Amino acid sequence: MKAWQCAAAGGQDDLALLEVPAPLPRPGEVLVRVRAAALNFSDLLMLRGVYQVRPRPPFVPGQEIAGVVAGDGALWRRGARVAGKVFWGGFAEEVAVREDMLFGLPDDVPFEEGAALPVIWPTAWIALHDRARLSAGETVLIHAGAGGVGSAALQLARAAGARVFATAGGPDKAALCQELGAAAVFDTGSGPWLEPLMRLTDGRGVDVVFDPVGGETTDQSVKALARNGRLLIVGFAGGAIPAIKANRLLLKNASALGVYWSHDTDAPLVEHALAEVLALRAAGSIRLMVSQRHAFADLRKALVALQERRTVGKSVVTLP
């Protein structure tokens, strides 16, 4: 089979499209013929050897896939349409996947959209509904609202009845956030966002901040919290892991909440989150934002675009 293999921890330049043996499923796994695979910022970190999951080179990256089960397993039968998360190995024609990490893909959900589901949508749903306990009528600030997980969180917050603000880098990304329902969008390329946000909330701040960026953004986000506010720590796409000033949380009676899940510890919650997301999609309340579709052979170009912040929503590569 063909697969994109990383020979050394250095980045996408170390990727090569090679002919490699198909993986052999272990007990509890099935082989999936990949029809689409989604890109994540964590793929870039894994290629550089700085992600918390560090496979030994040579390895095949890729953590979100959708496709067709190639052989019968304990839970899945040959021909089933599925999507799921893998630790790595997704940028290949076939991948062995733990059966409990797959979910059935409805017939009306294209493989490209299915590949965009397994990571960002449960993350956004769990952050807002399980960790922050978001209620209708509350105010939410979504950082990087045009990105993959940001655009998911923006839509889920709107669907929950919240008033949503967003930050975005550039006018095109800001326009997308407005299209998705943000009440106001702050273009981070045009100046600071904290003061305008505080004006729009009459100095109160927001009930929830969804932060996948980290660094200085997190420090400013603590200042943006209202009393009893919740800061959701989703990731560090900006590259810097922040130190949160606990005295500011204390004075606002606020909380900083980490957002991390796994199938080993949170399987029922993840299953519930995915069911809720698919129901919202079926009702027309959200869109699974696949904004960039690339041929499998163009994976390297797609990763460069992601690294250079030239993408909105999700990027996927497709296979015949």
Model regions and ranges:
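Glycine-rich beta-strand-centered segment in the early N-terminal region that forms part
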Residues: 21-38, 50-89, 108
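Glycine-rich phosphate-binding loop and adjacent beta-alpha segment
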Residues: 216-286, 319-320
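Short amphipathic alpha-helix with an adjacent loop that forms part of the alpha/beta core around
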Residues: 193-203
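NAD(P)H cofactor-binding loop motif with strongest signal on the N-terminal glycine-rich segment
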Residues: 144-145, 213, 236
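Short helix-loop-beta connector
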Residues: 107-110, 133-139, 203-204
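C-terminal capping/lid region of NAD(P)-dependent oxidoreductase domains
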Residues: 1, 283-290, 300-320
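Mid-domain Rossmann-like dinucleotide-binding core that forms the NAD(H)/NADP(H) cofactor-binding site
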Residues: 115-191
